[in-house]
Design a protein with these regions (language model features):
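Membrane-embedded transmembrane-helix bundle of lipid-linked glycan/lipid transferases
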Residues: 1-250
Length: 250
């Protein structure tokens, strides 16, 4: 298990064992082991249920911020958890929530980003609560980027979908300047270790190719089917060649 190996790499003092990659989840599990003696294997085995709970709670908090009735929130969450949609991509996405992997570990942060952005826009200028919300928005954004780049991309689109309804407040001079400063601070906080590692010669981790596949449109249900079909065809050809060789030797 690749993430298991990276965490043990941290224990051995080898940061970014297989290249530069957001390692906030790995550092969290490593810290749990060092501070509390929780075995790395146990964290990997059971943390999925915990971060899934945090994910659902974050969704609840965001929906409570934008919906008047708490029962509507319960209805939305119930539908999300129970409606059976026969779609391979959706089934695959839900199944990933049970695993301890960085993208799913950080999903809760995107909902916190949106929630604190909404709160920031609603509060009066220069109030203590507004400053607190801006700080928490910055920390949520920094956490998303330190955990997984794709979580930050999702947070951007989620925040944008709510910002559309308060576009005038977004571009007010005081608000816009603070938001830009918050985003810059979040990027600096989360990327300094990765930038320094890359600048000192550590290569990027190879899984960035996944992002390129998404951009190219090959990481789809059809694309995965084509890959599986090509592998099956290659296996069939290998089997046919083996039988031909066996018959020739006879």
């Amino acid at each position: 298990y690749v993430h298991h190996a990276w965490i043990y790499g941290l224990q051995e003092g080898k940061i970014f064992l297989e290249g530069v990659y957001p390692e906030a989840m790995h550092c969290f599990i490593y810290a749990m082991n060092v501070l509390f003696g929780i075995p790395v294997y146990s964290s990997l085995l059971f943390l999925g249920e915990i971060h899934t709970s945090a994910f659902l709670i974050a969704i609840y908090c965001l929906l409570r911020e934008v919906m008047k009735s708490q029962y509507t929130v319960y209805l939305v969450l119930t539908a999300f958890l129970t409606v059976d949609v026969m779609c391979v991509d959706e089934i695959y996405g839900i199944s990933r929530l049970q695993y301890t992997i960085p993208q799913e570990f950080g999903l809760y942060t995107e909902f916190l980003c949106a929630m604190y952005l909404i709160r920031f826009m609603r509060k009066k200028q220069d109030s203590k609560e507004k400053k607190d919300d801006m700080f928490l928005f910055t920390m949520a954004l920094a956490s998303s980027l330190a955990i997984h780049f794709y979580v930050t991309i999702m947070a951007f689109f989620l925040c944008g979908s709510f910002a559309v309804f308060g576009i005038r407040k977004i571009f007010q001079k005081k608000n816009f300047g603070k938001l830009i400063a918050a985003v810059i601070a979040a990027v600096v906080i989360s990327t300094i270790p990765m930038v320094l590692a890359f600048a000192t010669g550590t290569p990027l981790q190879g899984s960035l190719n996944w992002g390129m596949n998404i951009i190219n449109g090959t990481d789809t249900k059809e694309g995965r089917t084509q890959v599986a079909q090509s592998i099956n065809d290659e296996s069939s050809m290998d089997e046919a060649a083996r039988k031909l060789l066996e018959s020739s030797s006879e």
